[in-house]
Amino acid sequence: MQINTPNLVNCRQLRAARVLAGLTQKTLGAALNVDERQIRFWERRIPTNPRKAARIEQALLANGVALFTEPTAGARFA
């Protein structure tokens, strides 16, 4: 599934989605080929690069969690 407009809009949404997917910061980092410290950073300050946000969203979707922005930002099982 191609994501055109990233639905990742805030750091709380990222953390909630990661936990819902049953991923640790380390395992999500491994899925994205980044260090777990980068995940911790993104959970405090969301990435502004749309490509990074799309990669994160794809990794979460691959683990069964979809992000959404309407009516409010959140995450749900895909």
What residue ranges belong to the model's regions?
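A short, Lys/Arg-rich alpha-helix, primarily the initiator
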Residues: M1-L20, F68
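DNA major-groove recognition helix of helix-turn-helix/homeodomain DNA-binding modules
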Residues: P50-T69
